């Protein structure tokens, strides 16, 4: 559902959009603020950026948002993982993919969707839509991931690693191993960027270069 109105500034458009997740009976609302006339070019490219908790997804997302806001729309997909039942999570992810592609369609910018989810989780999506989805995982070695998680906690609450939820840490290490061990020839195909010896700026550079190569093909 789309409701369109003119904003106070001449030429600006605000679009109130709704997406209904049939499984959850939840209506997702979001607004698009478009400067000037709406662009007609339809990009509809969706990049799914995955990686274990603590690997640096949010930091890299902020860098990309600051650098390339005219090229990418950055969205975080934490809500995809809040439900406990697999069938509900699947429906929720499909709804979020619809939202992402809708935003890309309306803004003529590619959407970069950050979510800790394996590509297999999106296999139930329509094949034509799936062709426009591109998967990449951010990984690093185990010791580096521990160091980053420890640093994250110190910044947030000045706690040492011994006080971090051990279950949370172990789950993150396991997921990082799965992402690291996945080959690019598995379906769906997934690119992998090893950030072990890279800072956030360098990691953002590699991610941007990979996405740019794909966009030039469309």
Q: How does the language model describe each region?
A:
Residues 49:
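Hydrophobic anchor at the beta1->P-loop junction of P-loop NTPases
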Residues 52:
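P-loop (Walker A) phosphate-binding loop of NTP-binding proteins
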Residues 62-102:
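Conserved substrate/cofactor phosphate-moiety recognition/catalytic segment
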